């Protein structure tokens, strides 16, 4: 076999294998984007909601006058930070880009609440937490039941008990705030 025949053979083999290589490369790029639009939307919405809970939890620790509200805020910051970390890993594994900043809607909620303080903050924050957790439970239950991706469904299912616990705690804390009608500071810190 002459050099020119050998070169032609190599060129032909390379040319024939190029489409296969490109197809495999394209398939590997799209494998992470095979996430359904509803699963992707759930991840993004859950991430925004989680960031909101963390920000409002920090605000509650600073602005609330009732120690139970401060404690609730601390719990929200801790639990939602943990859930956010888990969600970030799933998003990264699935090729979903998450914003590191709150969107306008959630930023507006933070801005509105942080203008309040004391008993007024306590009442509004707890009202919002009850409402927010009811909505979160519906969304997470829907994802757990109807989600397409096993990892996203698992995250939703595993997070649901914590959200339900948060709702119960939010309702009891809101009742305490309503019934006290004023702040109840303890003398121990």
Model-derived regions: residue spans:
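His/Met- and acidic-residue-enriched segments that coordinate or traffic transition-metal cofactors
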Residues: 2-189
């Amino acid at each position: 076999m002459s050099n020119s025949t050998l070169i032609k053979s190599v060129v032909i083999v390379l040319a024939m294998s190029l489409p296969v290589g490109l197809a495999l490369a394209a398939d590997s790029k799209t494998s992470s984007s095979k996430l359904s639009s509803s699963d992707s939307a759930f991840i993004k919405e859950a991430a925004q909601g989680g960031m909101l809970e963390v920000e409002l939890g920090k605000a509650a620790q600073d602005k609330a006058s009732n120690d139970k509200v401060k404690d609730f805020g601390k719990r929200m910051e801790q639990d939602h930070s943990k859930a956010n970390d888990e969600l970030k890993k799933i998003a990264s594994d699935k090729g979903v880009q998450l914003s590191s900043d709150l969107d306008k809607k959630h930023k507006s909620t933070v801005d509105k609440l942080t203008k309040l303080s004391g008993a007024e903050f306590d009442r509004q924050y707890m009202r919002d937490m009850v409402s927010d957790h009811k909505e979160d439970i519906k969304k997470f239950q829907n994802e757990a039941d109807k989600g397409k991706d096993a990892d996203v469904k698992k995250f939703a299912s595993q997070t649901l008990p914590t959200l339900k616990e948060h709702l119960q705690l939010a309702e009891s804390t809101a009742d305490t705030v309503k019934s006290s009608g004023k702040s109840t500071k303890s003398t121990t810190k």
